[in-house]
Amino acid sequence: MAPPSAPLLLRAVGEAGPTRKRGRRPRALKFVDVAVYFSSEEWGCLQPAQRTLYRDVMRETYGLLGALGCAGPKPALISWLERNTDDWEPAALDPQEYRRWVTFQRKTRSKQKTEEKDVFPPKEAPRKGKRGRKPSKPRLIPRQTSGGPICPDCGCTFPDHLALESHKCAQNLKKPYPCPDCGRRFSYPSLLVSHRRAHSGECPYVCDQCGKRFSQRKNLSQHQVIHTGEKPYHCPDCGRCFRRSRSLANHRTTHTGEKPHQCPSCGRRFAYPSLLAIHQRTHTGEKPYTCLECSRRFRQRTALVIHQRIHTGEKPYPCPDCERRFSSSSRLVSHRRVHSGERPYACENCEARFSQRSTLLQHQLLHTGEKPYPCPDCGRAFRRSGSLAIHRSTHTEEKLHACDDCGRRFAYPSLLASHRRVHSGERPYACDLCSKRFAQWSHLSQHQLLHTGEKPFPCLECGRCFRQRWSLAVHKCCPNTPNGSPRPLIGGPSQRSSAL
C-alpha cells in the first residue's frame, strides 16, 4: 500500500468543518471534528518522522481546543499518543468515537460535492432548433470567500484561526525539513542541502571551460549554454531567444504588462512572487547572503556572486573593443557606451546627456545645489563620496604614496598613477573623433564636449551653461553686466586696449 499523502495526515477545519445554519446556535467545536484517524495499514505506511509530526500536531490541536474551552474529556487517541508507542493499538481507540468521525467525513464529502456544483455549474442541454451548433461552454468562475484569516503561503481563506493553524501544520507535513538560517521548508533533505549553499556560499560544481563555480548542478548546466551559444527558448510574440525558460517568462511580461503581485508596504507591483520577495527585503532589511571572506551581507544572491569576484579577481566579461575585462555584465554594458558614444540618460533641466545613470544623478546635484557628503572634521560638504575621501586626506595629512621622480606624495595610488604620466608623457586616452590624446580620463571627457556641444555646468542664477566647472566658477565671481555683455576680467584684453 502506498504511503498516504500529506493532506491525508491532516485536513484543515476550513475544508471539513460543518457549515453554520441561520437561526441556529452554533455547535461547539470538538476534537473529533479536527482529529485524523488511521487504520493499521495506513499507520504502517507512515515514516518515523511522519509519525512524530503526527503526534505533535494532534497534541497541539488538542491543546488549542483546551485553550478555547472546547477540549472536553481526554479522547482515547490522545491517551494512546501520550504513551509514545509505535505499535498500532486498535483497542486504544473508542469505536464509537471512530464511527462518529467516519460519519462526519461522509457528511463533509457530500457537502464538498454540493459546493462543487455551485462553483462549477453543470453543462446546459443543447437548445432545440439549432442544428450543427454546439452549445457554448459555461464560464468556470470559482466562488470567492472572504472574512476569514488567509494563509500567507498559498492564499487560501479559512473560517477561523484554528483552521488556519491546522492548515499550516498540514503544509509542514508536506515539507518537514526547515532551513535553520531562514526558516524556509523543503520536501526532501537533498533540496535542503542544496538550498543551504546559498547561505554558506559553497560552490562545488565547476565549469570545465572557464572555471566558474556554482552551488547547484542545474545552474552549471544553464551556464554551459553560454559557451555553446544555444538559446532554445523562443518568444512567440517577438521571436527573441533566451537561454533559460525563466528569462523567457520574465520577458513575456513586457508584452502583457501583467504584474499581479503587489507589495503590501509600498504598493509596487511585480510579475513574479520571487521578485516581490526580493523587493520586500528592502523594507525588512533582511540580507540572507553572507560573504565568507569579509562577512558582508547582501539581499540578492547575484549581488553576492559579483562581490565575491573582488576577492577572487575574476573578471569573466571582456570588452571586444579594448580587451578590458569586467566582473559583471552590467558594468561591461556601461563601459561599451564609451566606445559607441551612446548617452541614453538625459537631464530634464539642461538637456545634457550621460552614458550612466549614476553620472546623471551626480549631475542633477548641480541644479539642486545639494551636497549630501559633509566632512565630519570641518563641515565642508561635497557632491561625491570620492571628493570627500580625497578632501579628508588634507586633515589627516596621510600621504603614503610618493612619486619616485619628484618626491611628491599622494593619498591614493590612483592619484599617484595619474601624476606619474606627467613625467613619462604617457597619454592613454584618445579621442575617437580627432585622435587627440590625453593623460587623464577627465581631460578627455572635457575635450569631447567640444565635439558634442554639451555644456553640463549651468548657472543657477541666470541659466547660462558652461563646458567646464572652472568656467562656471569664474562666471560666478564676475557676473554679466546689466546690458548683457560679460564684465571684463582684471588684466583682460579690454583693459589693455583702453590703456593704449
UniProtKB/Swiss-Prot annotation:
Disulfide linkages recorded for this protein, renumbered to the chain, are none
Q: Which GO terms describe its molecular function?
A: DNA binding; zinc ion binding
Q: Where in the cell is it found?
A: Nucleus
Bias-annotated ranges (Basic and acidic residues): 112-127
**Pfam families reported in the protein's UniProt record:** KRAB, zf-C2H2
The alphabetized UniProt keywords are:
DNA-binding, Isopeptide bond, Metal-binding, Nucleus, Repeat, Transcription, Transcription regulation, Ubl conjugation, Zinc, Zinc-finger
Q: Which PROSITE patterns match?
A: KRAB (PS50805), ZINC_FINGER_C2H2_1 (PS00028), ZINC_FINGER_C2H2_2 (PS50157)
Q: What is this protein called?
A: Zinc finger protein 689
Q: Could you tell me which species this protein originates from?
A: Mus musculus (Mouse)
